[in-house]
Amino acid sequence: VTXPDGVNTATNA
C-alpha cells in the first residue's frame, strides 16, 4: 500500500 512514510510501515512489514 502506498502512503506517506510511517503510515503503513506495520502493514507492509
Swiss-Prot record:
Q: In which pathway does it act?
A: Secondary metabolite metabolism; lignin degradation
The Gene Ontology biological process terms listed for this entry are:
hydrogen peroxide catabolic process; lignin catabolic process
Swiss-Prot/TrEMBL keywords: Heme, Hydrogen peroxide, Iron, Lignin degradation, Metal-binding, Oxidoreductase, Peroxidase
Cystine residue pairs: none
Q: Which stretches are annotated as coiled coil? A: none
Keyword presence, Transcription: no
Q: Catalysed reaction per UniProt? A: 1-(3,4-dimethoxyphenyl)-2-(2-methoxyphenoxy)propane-1,3-diol + H2O2 = 3,4-dimethoxybenzaldehyde + guaiacol + glycolaldehyde + H2O; 2 (3,4-dimethoxyphenyl)methanol + H2O2 = 2 (3,4-dimethoxyphenyl)methanol radical + 2 H2O
State the superkingdom: Eukaryota
**Recorded GO terms, molecular function?**
diarylpropane peroxidase activity; metal ion binding
Q: What is its EC number?
A: 1.11.1.14
Query: Which EC class is this protein assigned?
Result: oxidoreductase
Please explain the role this protein plays, according to its UniProt record: Depolymerization of lignin. Catalyzes the C(alpha)-C(beta) cleavage of the propyl side chains of lignin.
Entry similarity comment: Belongs to the peroxidase family. Ligninase subfamily.
What's the name of the protein? Ligninase B
- Annotated source species: Trametes versicolor
User: What taxonomic ancestry is recorded?
Assistant: Eukaryota, Fungi, Dikarya, Basidiomycota, Agaricomycotina
